[in-house]
Amino acid sequence: MVSLDIVRKFNGSLSSRLPRPVALFVGGTSGIGRSTLRQLALNTNAPTAYVVGRSESNARPLLKELGQLNPLGSFKFIEADVSLIRNVDKICEGIKTREKSLDLLFMTPGGLSLVGRRETSEGLDKLFALRYYSRIRFAQKLMPLLEAAEPAPGRVVSVLGGGFEGNINPDDLDLKKGYHILSCAMHSVTMTSLAMEHLAASRRASFVHVYPGLVGTNIYTNSFPSPLAAVYNYGMWPLMYPFSVNIDESGERHLFHATSERYPSNTIGNDRRLAARGELDPAIGSNGTFGSGAYLMNWKGDTSEAGKKMQKLRKEGMTERVWEHTTNLLDRTVR
C-alpha cells in the first residue's frame, strides 16, 4: 500500500515535477473524476485541463471553483455524448489542433444499469461503449500527443475494475448475442486490461487500470430512478460507509496514480537507471514484470498480475484478438 502521507508529499511536489501539465478528463464533472481534477488544480502550476461532460450548465460551478483554486490554470469544458465514437473522434481532433502534447488522459465515464442492451445510433451498447470502446478510442486517437509529452511520457488512466478480470466470450466480444449486466462488466474490465497491455508493449506512454474501491459518489443517483436511488442512498450506503474511501482521499490517490513515477512507461520501466530517478521503485506491471507500462491497480496503489485468468487469456492469444476486434469495430463504426 502507498501511504496517504507519501501520496500527499508527492502531490505537493507536482508544481516542480510536472510544470504546466496538459490533461483531458473524460467524465470529470462528478465523482472521482471531479475530485481528481480538483486535486490537479490544487497541486500544479498553471495546468491546462479539458473537461468532457454531458451538460455545460451543470459544469459551470465546477469550472468556477477550479479557476478559484488555480487562477493561472486554464479549464475548458467540452459538451459531448462520448457513447458515440464519432463524438470521441471530434473531441480528439479538436485537442490535437490546440495542443502539441498531453500529459494525462483520465477517464471515468459510464455508470450503472439494470436494463438490457441499449444500442446507440452507431450500434454499440451504450454502457459498454462508455466503459470500454470510447475510452480506448480516446487513447488510440490521442496517442501521438501522449507520446510527445516531456519530461515523462503521457499516462492513460481508466477508472473501472483493474484486478477483477475474468472470462470473456471470444466469439461475442461486443456482446451482440449474450448481453447482460455481468457480461458487460466482465468484458469491459477484461478487455480494458488486455488492450492496455497491447498498447504498453510498443508505445511511449503508460497505462493504468484502477479499481477505485467503494467511494461515496452520486453514481446511483445519476444511474437509477429516484425510488431505487433512495433505497441505496438511505438504506444501503449507511451500512457500507464504514468500509468506503472518502471522495477527497480518492481524488488525492488518483492524482498520484495519474502522475507518479511508480507507474512508468515500458520505455522507462525497462531502464532501471531512468526509473531510479523517482523516489519510488517501479511497480509490478500486469504481466508480472517491473515497469511494464500497463498496471492493474487497487485504490491503495497496489498492483497485481490479475492471476491465472489473465495468463490463460494471454496464452490463448486474446490480447491480440481483443485489440484486432476493437480497432476493426471502431473503424467500421465511424465509416
Located regions from the model:
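Glycine-rich NAD(P)-binding loop of the Rossmann-fold in SDR/ketoreductase-type enzymes
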Residues: 83, 126-134, 187, 245
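Amphipathic alpha-helical dimer-interface segment in Rossmann-like NAD(P)H-dependent oxidoreductases
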Residues: 130-150, 197-201
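Short alpha-helical oligomerization interface
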Residues: 113-131, 177-178
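A glycine-rich helix->loop->beta "capping" turn
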Residues: 71-76, 93-107, 111-119
